[in-house]
Curated annotation (Swiss-Prot):
Function field: Cysteine protease that plays a key role in autophagy by mediating both proteolytic activation and delipidation of ATG8 family proteins. The protease activity is required for proteolytic activation of ATG8 family proteins: cleaves the C-terminal amino acid of ATG8 proteins to reveal a C-terminal glycine. Exposure of the glycine at the C-terminus is essential for ATG8 proteins conjugation to phosphatidylethanolamine (PE) and insertion to membranes, which is necessary for autophagy. In addition to the protease activity, also mediates delipidation of ATG8 family proteins.
Organism expressing this protein natively: Xenopus tropicalis
Catalyses which reaction(s): [protein]-C-terminal L-amino acid-glycyl-phosphatidylethanolamide + H2O = [protein]-C-terminal L-amino acid-glycine + a 1,2-diacyl-sn-glycero-3-phosphoethanolamine
The protein, known as: Cysteine protease ATG4C
GO biological process terms, semicolon-separated: autophagy; protein delipidation; protein transport; proteolysis
Length: 450
């Protein structure tokens, strides 16, 4: 009886917490987001220009004519909007099956970094199976009338001219990344769209669902209700993909950089395992400063988000985790996991997809960013990894005034430098002793999540 009473109290607390988060964050979701004029907008390696060529438009974005048509802008605006909405949005959920050995039926208040990690991996899987150019056919249908920033008047503020700092190293062109499967047919691409979302479902058997990540976290001393930093989440995602049994997932793996170093030989070993070539998601936990983010690193962050290989950044600001997907000028564009939504049963045929897609982007100043974050990249094969390493090295060299970059590429294996990169794990232990020491250091520096 006593245990049952305790469970009832915990469930009541969960419901109250969910209601509080919805009250706190729902208004943020509905708040208008404005974009500045005369600047490009970058979204996961793509650059969008919304040029307004009518000479009657004044320098402040106004117009001397009241008869201008929206057609001048609507096409490009729709491209950006459709691209953003098509990214998978994973948020707090409530009333899902109880997490094993706990009374939790919601992750409100503690699961935001797990959610941002899920979103980054989901983007990697979208690129892997469907290609970077894929967009959801119904993306524009869920656009809310409350998001007035997409009106023609505001769109004029998006009139961009490529910044000089990017003109030498970046071209505003669509990514040529090809999908693993031929998804010319709508039915085929939508099947994979639903399948990818189902892998992140909130029930125990989902490969990358909250239940599985919490289960893996137990092996490193984490339990449901604890906060998880970006570095820890990186290793949980790696372990989750290692343990996945779906045949479709055997062609992709995850590499987590050790001490801000990517050992190329270890990446090649993962990609060319057992005679088959795999795609790799590379996760690099870094710090962009000490107590606060060093503003000198902003050019680095912009350079990273402008690369076609980038699948986003697990980061945030103190006490809140966000999934960063782009930028404009000095503001980062992100997806917010803090809005609490109801559990969706993905076992139902044609389950609703709307709640897995965010209708509106949000922006925040780079100076508010917490220094602790994890950067993600996707490389389909060894050749792409070589190209990514080359492009990343350019960004690292050009964006820092320090004598050393935020992370480096080193030829050879980690073990050649007395580090363990691909350890053999015991069933009851997620991390090796060396990794535990490094993660303990990371954990003491990472932000505390509400």
């Amino acid at each position: 009886m006593e245990a049952s009473g305790t469970d009832d109290v915990e469930k009541l607390k969960s419901k109250f917490l969910s209601a509080w988060h919805n009250m706190k964050y729902s208004w943020v979701l509905k708040t208008k987001t404005y974009f500045k004029r005369n600047s490009p907008v970058f979204l996961l390696g793509k650059c969008y220009h919304f040029k307004y060529e009518d000479s009657s438009v004044t320098s402040d974005g106004g117009s001397n004519s009241g008869s201008e048509s929206k057609e001048d802008l609507s096409g490009n605006v729709d491209e950006f909007r459709k691209d953003f909405i098509s990214r998978i949005w994973l948020t707090y959920r409530e009333e899902f099956p109880q997490i094993e050995t706990s009374s939790w039926t919601t992750d409100c208040g503690w699961g935001c970094t797990l959610r941002t990690g899920q979103m980054l991996l989901a983007q990697g899987l979208i690129v892997h199976f469907l290609g970077r150019d894929w967009t959801w056919t119904e993306a524009l249908d869920i656009f809310s009338s409350e998001s007035e920033f997409w009106t023609a008047n505001t769109a004029r503020k998006l009139t961009p001219s490529l910044e000089t700092s990017f003109s030498e190293n970046n071209e505003c062109v669509s990514s040529n990344k090809q999908p693993l499967h031929n998804c010319d047919k709508k039915s085929n691409s939508e099947d994979f769209h639903q399948k990818i979302i189902s892998w992140f479902a909130d029930y125990p058997l989902a490969y990358f669902g909250l239940h599985q990540l919490v289960k893996l976290g137990k092996n490193s001393g984490k339990v449901a209700g604890d906060w998880y930093g970006p570095a820890v989440v990186s290793h949980l995602l790696r372990k989750a993909i290692e343990e996945s049994s779906d045949p479709e997932l055997q062609g992709i793996t995850i590499y987590v950089a050790q001490d801000c170093t990517i050992y190329s030989a270890d990446v090649y070993d993962l990609q060319c395992n057992k005679g088959t070539e795999k795609a790799v998601v590379i996760l690099v936990p870094v710090r962009l400063g000490g107590e606060r983010t060093n503003m000198e690193y902003f050019e680095f962050v912009k350079g990273i988000l402008s690369l076609e290989f980038c699948i986003g950044i697990i980061g945030g600001k103190p006490k809140q985790s966000y999934y960063f997907v782009g930028f404009q000028d000095d503001s980062l564009i992100y997806m917010d996991p803090h809005y609490c939504q109801s559990f969706v049963d993905v076992s139902v045929k044609n389950f609703p997809l709307e709640s897995f897609h965010c209708p509106s982007p949000k922006k925040m100043s780079f100076k508010k960013m917490d220094p602790s974050c994890t950067i993600g990249f996707y490389c389909r094969n060894a050749r792409e990894f070589e190209k990514a390493a080359e492009e990343l090295t350019k960004v690292l060299k050009s964006s820092t005034k320090q004598n050393y970059p935020l992370f480096t590429f080193v030829n050879g294996h980690a073990q050649d430098f007395d580090f363990v990169c691909t350890p053999v794990y015991d069933q009851n232990d997620l991390f090796t002793e060396d990794e535990k020491k490094r993660l303990k250091r990371f954990s003491t520096e990472e932000f505390v999540l509400l």
